[in-house]
Amino acid sequence: MLATSDLWFRYQDEPVLKGLNLDFSLSPVTGLVGANGCGKSTLFMNLSGLLRPQKGAVLWQGKPLDYSKRGLLALRQQVATVFQDPEQQIFYTDIDSDIAFSLRNLGVPEAEITRRVDEALTLVDAQHFRHQPIQCLSHGQKKRVAIAGALVLQARYLLLDEPTAGLDPAGRTQMIAIIRRIVAQGNHVIISSHDIDLIYEISDAVYVLRQGQILMHGAPGEVFACTEAMEHAGLTQPWLVKLHTQLGLPLCKTETEFFHRMQKCAFREAS
């Protein structure tokens, strides 16, 4: 269980997170949305133990986080963060060594390291470029290497910061597929993103942050259909939700579902 209880965090005298009560164990994929400066990045750093709240707590397995060296090491094997810029967490020039780095530090046997690295590369669809030098990879490929580096730890929670930023449409589609495969293995994914359409499509629950507080929480369709809340948070609605709220069309979760329903309607009218 990863959650927060009355979480407060200040930078100097300025409160950034204000009494947050969040539970990320309730849904496979949880989306965090909000305008710049709402506290998403600070929340991620609190969840991973990089920052320590002045009041309240991050809860792991129902208990306040242990900030000792041993406690944080244990946490980061179960709660892994993948930053927006993959360059921040890639240190080697060859992919296998980079992904295996954390496992070797933990003293994991080489045979187990080989197995985990191979599984992680398969999961992120990176087997076909695993032998290329990292400096020759595209931005999207580097993102996949960074995710693989988190997956080898067999973390139960994966924090993804802007996973589709800088990706072309094909790369974005691949990233969605990767997230779905991670969740299919029984893991939890928490996504912070300005890609509202991504959050709507892939999340099971959404928290909307505004000035360090929770403005709204619920299922994506319910949250994003609330025009007033979206405007108050400084956000726009996903395009599929706009079609529903502004034109009265059926609310669909994905583009594929939308066009399938439209084709069925067109076929019935033509008949």
Curated annotation (Swiss-Prot):
UniProt keyword terms in alphabetical order: ATP-binding, Cell inner membrane, Cell membrane, Cobalamin biosynthesis, Cobalt, Cobalt transport, Ion transport, Membrane, Nucleotide-binding, Translocase, Transport
Domain of life: Bacteria
Transport as UniProt keyword: yes
Gene Ontology biological-process annotations: cobalamin biosynthetic process; cobalt ion transport
E.C. code: 7.-.-.-
Keyword Cell membrane among UniProt keywords: yes
Binding site for ATP: 34-41
Main subcellular location of this protein, as a coarse class: membrane
Domain ABC transporter, first and last residues per copy: 2-236
Pathway listed: Cofactor biosynthesis; adenosylcobalamin biosynthesis
Classification via Pfam families: ABC_tran
GO molecular function: ATP binding; ATP hydrolysis activity; ATPase-coupled transmembrane transporter activity
CDD domains, per database record: ABC_cobalt_CbiO_domain1
Record field: transmembrane: none
GO cellular component: ATP-binding cassette (ABC) transporter complex
Membrane-topology descriptor: Peripheral membrane protein
Subcellular location: Cell inner membrane
Biological function: Part of the energy-coupling factor (ECF) transporter complex CbiMNOQ involved in cobalt import. Presumably responsible for energy coupling to the transport system.
Protein family membership: Belongs to the ABC transporter superfamily. Cobalt importer (TC 3.A.1.18.1) family.
Subunit comment: Forms an energy-coupling factor (ECF) transporter complex composed of an ATP-binding protein (A component, CbiO), a transmembrane protein (T component, CbiQ) and 2 possible substrate-capture proteins (S components, CbiM and CbiN) of unknown stoichimetry.
Name of the molecule in the record: Cobalt import ATP-binding protein CbiO
Species in which this protein is naturally found: Salmonella typhi
This protein's encoding gene: cbiO
